[in-house]
């Protein structure tokens, strides 16, 4: 229940920079995934405001997905980052990275990682 409270309260805007660094992607790319215009991000970050609950949940789930992906790839960041950018048949030929803009997409990527971890096609 604490997690729900954190999501409802919101997390800092600069948490987008954290996942951006972890994925070795420009902040601009992460803003596109989360659906926040650069100008809005800059303004709200400078005012130390918090992400709304939807965006907070996405950022938290993406961060957890990164943790899981690194675990599956034995902490080999480059391999995991490459995997995120390659089309994947288990998610309809899309790249995992393109699925990160919705909770359902994140879950599909997580299922794909799970299949990979346990030796099924991913």
Describe each region flagged by the PLM.
Residues 1-122:
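Non-transmembrane "mature" sequence context
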């Amino acid at each position: 229940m604490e997690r729900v409270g954190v999501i409802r309260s919101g997390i800092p805007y600069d948490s987008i920079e954290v996942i951006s660094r972890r994925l070795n992607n420009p902040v601009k790319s992460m803003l596109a995934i989360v659906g926040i215009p650069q100008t809005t991000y800059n303004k709200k970050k400078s005012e130390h405001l918090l992400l709304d609950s939807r965006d907070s949940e996405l950022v938290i789930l993406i961060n957890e997905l990164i943790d899981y992906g690194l675990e599956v790839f034995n902490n080999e960041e480059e391999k995991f980052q490459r995997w995120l950018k390659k089309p994947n048949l288990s998610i309809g030929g899309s790249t995992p990275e393109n699925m990160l803009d919705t909770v359902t997409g994140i879950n599909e990527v997580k299922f794909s990682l799970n299949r990979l971890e346990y030796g099924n096609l991913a």
